[in-house]
C-alpha cells in the first residue's frame, strides 16, 4: 500500500497502480480516453493530466499524465489545480476540432464516454470554425457500424483488437492528425470478439449495427441483470428492451467471470427472442389444426388428459433453468424424469462433473484462467465451444511478457514497455483437435488427430509426468519427442492448466485430461482443470440427474409410457429424427413447453408458450459449477394482452397443482428455489446466487429503468389512451419502473445497467468496483456449488486403441462454429450471413479415392435421408474421417462419432 495526497487529503492506495487508476478507485473523477483497465497505459490522449508536487511545501508543481505516473508512497498531486483543469479542457478542445457536432444523431449519444469527459472538463463552447477532416466509412460486417469521422485517435480499438484479442484485420493507417482506424479494405471483422469494440471505443466510431435497426437511447431501455444463454461459460450480460423487443446486449461486469468482454455470439445472438413465429399462446391440436387456448383452458385440458394416462414421463433440457427442470421432475416424478440429452453426451457430462467434484483439482473461474503459465487443451476447439475461455487463454499466454517485465521491475500497467520487453514471448500452449483451431496462431504445437489419438497423447503425457499413471503402447518416436517437450513445459510451470470438455465426443479425452492434472498435482504444481460443456445449464442438469433421451424414447416405443412432456428441447438435435418422430407418434399425449418453434411441435398435441430468458427468472450453472441468476427484462403481456407466455416452471407447477386439485403453492421464484434446495442438497447453494424477493435498499426495490426513462405513458397510446398499470414483479427485488434504487454506491451486486452521476457510458462500471478492474464493491454475483475435494480420483486406466481407418467407412469428426452450432443463436437473422454454408470436410487422400475435388457435391445417407453437401479439403483431418459442422441445419450434434458407409459423388 502507498499513501498519496490529493488536493490536500491523504489516501491509502495500491502502490502498484498508476495515479489514474488509484484516483478512480477512490471515487475521484479524472477524465481519460486512451486508458482502459484491461488494456493498461500508453499516455496517448494526454487527457488525464494532474499537477504533481515534489512535497507538501512545493507550490509550483508540474503537469503529469496520471495514467503514466506510479502511485508511489508520498506522492502529492492536485486534480483541481487551475492549470491542470485548463490543460484538460484544452485537450478536449483539440479533439473536438475534427469531431462532428452530431450528438443528436449519433448512436453513442447518452452512452458516450466522450460526452461524459467533455462535460467533466467543462468544455462547452466551440471556437474552431474551419474545415473538419473527413473520412470514408467502411462496411465491417453485420455486427458493427463504422463512422470514422467521430474518431479522436485514442488508439483503444487497435490496442484491444490487435494486442488483447490478437485480431489481425484491424489497424491504424496514416500519420499525425490524419489517421484512420479500420481494415485494409471493406469486409467483415474476423475476430470472434469484435463486438467489444462497441464498448471499448469511447466515441461513436464503432456502434452496434444490430441495435441500429431498432434504435433507441440507453436511457429509454429497460434492463435486468442476466446470464448469456449461448454456451456453458455463463458470462454476465445486461439485455436492454423497448416496446417488447430486445434491442441490444451489453457486457455486465463481473470481476470473477467475464469482466469487461463478451464474445460475438453472446453479444449479437439474441435475435431469437424477437422472432415473430414464437409460440405466444397455448395451442391444442384439433385434427390437423391448432386452436388457441387461454391459460386456464390449457391447464384443464392438459390435466384431463394426464389423469387418463397410465405413465407420464418428462424430458428436460440443458438450455432450461434449474427451476424449470425441477418443476418438470416434480410433475412426473424423479423416476420418470429424463435429461433430454443423448446417452453418450450424458456419460461425458457425468464424468466431467465427477472430475470437477471429486478429482481434487482446482477449477478456476474464467478470470483466473488468465493467471496460468502453461495450458494444455485436449479435444476442445475452445474458440467455437466456449469462446470467452479462448480469450482468457490468450491473456494467459501473454503472461510471459508480463513475467519478463516484472523481473525488470516494470509495472503491470506499463503495457508499451511490457510488449517491448516481451517481443511476442509466450507461455506454452498446446492444443489437440481433429483439425485446425483458432488458437493455433498462439500455440507452441497443435496436434491434429482423431479423438482416440488425442486421448492417447493425453494418457502418454500423464504417464511421462508420473510413472504410476497408465502407460501407452505404440507411441511413434516423432510423437514421443513432442510429448517430451509438452511434459517439460507442464512440469516446469508453476500454474499449469488443463482444458477439456464434452464436445469432442470422447470419454477417454476427459479421462486423459484428468490424468494429466492428477500427475501434475502429484509433482506439487498449482494445477487447474477446466471442463467445457455444451449448453448454458448442462452442469445444472447433470447435477440434477435423470435418464438419457434414448431411455425416454424406449419408454414411449414400448408403450410403458403413454404421455410425455418435453421441456425446451428440440429432440432432433439429440437423437435420430426418425426415431424421435416414431416414438412421439406412439404417445396419445405429447406436450411441448418451449419459447421457440421446433420440429417436434409437429407431433405435439398441446403446446405451452414459454418465456425466454429475457421474459423469465431462473438459475443456471456454468462450466465451473457457478450458480448464477438471470432476471426478467420485461413482461411481454404488457404490450399485448393476448400474449400468454409464462416461465416454464410456472406452467409446469400450475399443471401439477391442477392435476392434484390443489392451490398453486409456488407463487414466486423463491418458493421454487426453496423446493429445489429441500429435494436436492447439492443445489443448496443456488439460494445464495442472488438475494430473494424481499431484498430492499432503504425500503426500495431496484429499478430496471434509468431515471431518465421517457415515453412510458405514451408507449401504448396507439392501442388505448388508458394507461395500464406497470407490471408487478413478485419474483425478484426488481421493479418494472424507473422508480426504485439505482445508486452505484448501494449495497448490491445485481446491477441491471451501469450508470453513475457524470458517467453514462460503460466506463461507469468504475463506480461499482472495489478497485478499478477488480471485483464489484459488494462482491461478484454468483456462487460456486462445489470446491476442490481433499482426496482425488484414481488414475483412469482405459487407454483407447489407435484410430484405424476402414475401407469404405468414414467416421464423423465434429467441427463446431461460433456462428451456427448453437441451437438458439443460429435462429438470429443477423447470424445467417456469418454462418458457413453446410459442408463436408475430406482429407486429400480420401478425396482422391472418391475422385472428388473442393466444391464437388457428395452425398450420404443418414437417418433415412440422403444428405448432399459440397466438399472442402482439410489437410489436417486424418484420413478415414469426414468433418461435419455440428448443430447446423440437418446435422445434429449427436452425429459426432457416427460412421458413414455410402459416401459418394452426388448425381448431377
Swiss-Prot record:
InterPro entries: 2Fe-2S_ferredoxin-like_sf (IPR036010), 2Fe-2S_ferredoxin-type (IPR001041), Asp_de-COase-like_dom_sf (IPR009010), MoPterin_dinucl-bd_dom (IPR006657), Mopterin_OxRdtase (IPR006656), Mopterin_OxRdtase_4Fe-4S_dom (IPR006963), NADH_UbQ_OxRdtase_75kDa_su_CS (IPR000283), NADH_UbQ_OxRdtase_ferredoxin (IPR054351)
Reaction equation(s) it catalyzes: a quinone + NADH + 5 H(+)(in) = a quinol + NAD(+) + 4 H(+)(out)
Binding of [2Fe-2S] cluster, residues: 34, 45, 48, 67
CDD domains referenced in this protein's UniProt entry, alphabetically: fer2, MopB_CT_NDH-1_NuoG2-N7, MopB_NDH-1_NuoG2-N7
GO terms of molecular function: 2 iron, 2 sulfur cluster binding; 4 iron, 4 sulfur cluster binding; metal ion binding; molybdopterin cofactor binding; NADH dehydrogenase (ubiquinone) activity; quinone binding
Cofactor(s) needed: [2Fe-2S] cluster; [4Fe-4S] cluster
Residue sites binding [4Fe-4S] cluster 1 per the record: 99, 103, 106, 112
Membrane topology: Peripheral membrane protein
GO annotation (BP), single: aerobic respiration
Subcellular locations according to the entry: Cytoplasm; Cell inner membrane
Domain 4Fe-4S His(Cys)3-ligated-type per the UniProt entry, residue ranges: 83-122
UniProt xrefs under NCBIfam families: NuoG
Assembly mode: Composed of 13 different subunits. Subunits NuoCD, E, F, and G constitute the peripheral sector of the complex.
Function of the molecule: NDH-1 shuttles electrons from NADH, via FMN and iron-sulfur (Fe-S) centers, to quinones in the respiratory chain. The immediate electron acceptor for the enzyme in this species is believed to be ubiquinone. Couples the redox reaction to proton translocation (for every two electrons transferred, four hydrogen ions are translocated across the cytoplasmic membrane), and thus conserves the redox energy in a proton gradient.
Protein name per the record: NADH-quinone oxidoreductase subunit G
Organism: Escherichia coli (strain K12)
Amino acid at each position: 500500500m502507498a499513501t498519496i495526497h490529493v488536493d490536500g487529503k491523504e489516501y491509502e492506495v495500491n502502490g502498484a497502480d498508476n495515479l489514474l487508476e488509484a484516483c478512480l478507485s477512490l471515487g475521484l473523477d479524472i477524465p481519460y480516453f486512451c486508458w482502459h483497465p484491461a488494456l493498461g497505459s500508453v499516455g496517448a490522449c494526454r487527457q488525464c493530466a494532474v499537477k504533481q508536487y515534489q512535497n507538501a511545501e512545493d507550490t509550483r508543481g508540474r503537469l503529469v499524465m496520471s495514467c503514466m505516473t506510479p502511485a508511489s508512497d508520498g506522492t502529492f498531486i492536485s486534480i483541481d489545480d487551475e492549470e491542470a483543469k485548463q490543460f484538460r479542457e484544452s485537450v478536449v478542445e483539440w479533439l473536438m476540432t475534427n469531431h462532428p457536432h452530431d450528438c443528436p444523431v449519433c448512436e453513442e449519444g447518452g452512452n458516450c464516454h466522450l460526452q461524459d469527459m467533455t462535460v467533466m472538463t467543462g468544455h462547452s463552447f466551440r471556437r474552431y470554425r474551419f474545415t473538419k477532416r473527413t473520412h470514408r466509412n467502411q462496411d465491417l460486417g453485420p455486427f458493427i457500424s463504422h463512422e470514422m469521422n467521430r474518431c479522436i485517435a485514442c488508439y483503444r480499438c487497435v490496442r484491444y483488437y490487435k494486442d488483447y484479442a490478437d485480431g489481425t484485420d484491424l489497424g491504424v493507417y496514416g500519420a499525425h492528425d490524419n489517421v484512420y482506424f479500420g481494415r485494409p479494405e471493406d469486409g467483415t471483422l474476423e475476430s470472434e470478439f469484435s463486438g467489444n469494440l462497441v464498448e471499448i471505443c469511447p466515441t461513436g466510431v464503432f456502434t452496434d449495427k444490430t441495435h441500429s435497426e431498432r434504435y433507441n437511447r440507453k436511457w429509454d431501455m429497460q434492463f435486468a441483470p442476466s446470464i448469456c444463454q449461448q454456451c456453458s461459460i455463463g458470462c454476465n450480460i445486461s439485455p436492454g428492451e423497448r416496446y417488447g423487443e430486445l434491442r441490444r446486449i451489453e457486457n455486465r461486469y463481473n470481476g470473477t467471470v467475464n469482466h469487461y468482454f463478451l464474445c460475438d455470439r453472446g453479444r449479437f445472438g439474441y435475435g431469437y427472442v424477437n422472432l415473430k413465429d414464437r409460440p405466444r399462446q397455448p395451442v391444442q391440436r384439433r385434427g390437423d389444426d391448432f386452436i388457441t387456448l387461454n391459460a386456464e383452458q390449457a391447464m384443464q385440458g392438459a390435466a384431463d388428459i394426464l389423469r387418463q394416462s397410465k405413465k407420464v414421463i418428462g424430458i428436460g433440457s440443458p438450455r432450461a433453468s434449474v427451476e424449470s427442470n425441477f418443476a418438470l421432475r416434480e410433475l412426473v416424478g424423479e423416476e420418470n424424469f429424463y435429461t433430454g440429452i443423448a446417452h453418450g453426451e450424458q456419460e461425458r457430462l457425468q464424468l466431467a462433473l465427477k472430475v470437477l467434484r471429486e478429482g481434487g483439482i482446482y477449477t478456476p473461474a474464467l478470470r483466473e484462467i488468465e493467471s496460468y503459465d502453461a495450458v494444455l487443451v485436449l479435444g476442445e476447439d475452445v474458440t467455437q465451444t466456449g469462446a470467452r475461455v479462448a480469450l482468457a487463454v490468450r491473456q494467459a499466454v501473454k503472461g510471459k511478457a508480463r513475467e519478463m517485465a516484472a523481473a525488470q521491475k516494470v509495472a503491470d500497467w506499463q503495457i508499451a514497455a511490457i510488449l517491448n520487453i516481451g517481443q511476442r514471448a509466450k507461455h506454452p500452449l498446446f492444443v489437440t483437435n481433429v483439425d485446425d483451431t483458432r488458437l493455433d496462431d498462439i500455440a507452441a504445437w497443435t496436434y491434429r488427430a482423431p479423438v482416440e489419438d488425442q486421448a492417447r497423447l493425453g494418457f502418454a503425457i500423464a504417464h511421462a509426468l508420473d510413472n504410476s499413471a497408465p502407460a501407452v503402447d505404440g507411441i511413434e518416436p516423432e510423437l514421443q519427442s513432442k510429448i517430451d517437450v509438452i511434459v517439460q513445459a507442464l512440469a516446469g510451470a508453476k500454474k499449469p492448466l488443463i482444458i477439456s470438455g464434452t464436445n469432442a465426443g470422447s470419454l477417454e479425452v476427459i479421462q486423459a485430461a484428468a490424468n494429466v492434472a492428477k500427475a501434475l498435482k502429484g509433482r506439487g504444481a498449482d494445477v487447474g482443470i477446466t471442463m467445457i460443456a455444451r449448453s448454458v445449464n448442462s452442469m445444472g442438469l447433470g447435477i440434477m440427474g435423470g435418464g438419457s433421451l434414448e431411455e425416454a424414447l424406449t419408454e414411449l416405443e414400448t408403450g410403458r409410457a403413454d404421455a410425455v412432456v418435453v421441456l425446451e428441447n428440440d429432440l432432433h438435435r439429440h437423437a435420430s429424427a426418425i426415431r424421435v418422430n416414431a416414438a412421439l407418434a406412439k404417445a396419445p399425449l405429447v406436450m411441448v413447453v418451449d419459447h421457440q418453434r421446433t420440429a417436434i411441435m409437429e407431433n405435439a398435441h398441446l403446446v405451452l408458450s414459454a418465456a425466454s430468458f429475457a421474459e423469465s427468472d431462473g438459475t443456471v450453472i456454468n462450466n465451473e459449477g457457478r450458480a448464477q441468476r438471470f432476471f426478467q427484462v420485461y413482461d411481454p403481456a404488457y404490450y399485448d394482452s393476448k400474449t400468454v407466455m409464462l416461465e416454464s416452471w410456472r406452467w409446469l407447477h400450475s399443471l401439477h397443482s391442477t392435476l392434484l386439485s390443489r392451490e398453486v403453492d409456488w407463487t414466486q421464484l423463491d418458493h421454487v428455489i426453496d423446493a429445489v434446495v429441500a429435494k436436492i442438497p447439492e443445489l443448496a447453494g443456488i439460494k445464495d446466487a442472488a438475494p430473494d424477493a424481499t431484498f430492499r435498499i432503504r425500503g426500495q426495490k431496484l429499478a430496471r429503468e434509468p431515471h431518465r426513462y421517457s415515453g412510458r405513458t405514451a408507449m401504448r397510446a396507439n392501442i388505448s389512451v388508458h394507461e395500464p398499470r406497470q407490471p408487478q414483479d413478485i419474483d425478484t427485488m426488481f421493479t418494472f419502473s424507473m422508480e426504485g434504487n439505482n445508486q452505484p454506491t448501494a449495497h448490491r451486486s445485481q446491477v441491471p445497467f451501469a450508470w453513475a452521476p457524470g458517467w453514462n457510458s460503460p466506463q461507469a462500471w468504475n463506480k461499482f468496483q472495489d478497485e478499478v478492474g477488480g471485483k464489484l464493491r459488494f462482491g461478484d454475483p454468483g456462487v460456486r456449488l462445489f470446491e476442490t475435494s481433499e482426496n482425488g480420483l484414481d488414475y483412469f486406466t482405459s487407454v483407447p486403441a489407435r484410430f484405424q481407418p476402414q475401407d469404405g467407412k468414414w467416421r464423423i469428426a465434429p467441427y463446431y462454429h461460433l456462428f451456427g452450432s448453437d441451437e438458439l443463436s443460429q435462429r438470429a437473422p443477423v447470424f445467417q450471413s456469418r454462418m458457413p454454408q453446410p459442408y463436408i470436410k475430406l482429407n486429400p487422400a480420401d478425396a482422391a479415392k472418391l475422385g472428388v475435388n473442393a466444391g464437388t457435391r457428395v452425398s450420404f445417407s443418414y437417418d433415412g435421408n440422403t444428405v448432399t453437401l459440397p466438399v472442402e479439403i482439410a489437410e489436417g483431418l486424418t484420413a478415414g474421417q469426414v468433418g461435419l459442422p455440428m448443430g447446423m441445419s440437418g446435422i445434429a450434434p449427436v452425429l459426432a462419432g457416427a460412421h458413414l458407409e455410402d459416401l459418394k459423388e452426388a448425381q448431377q
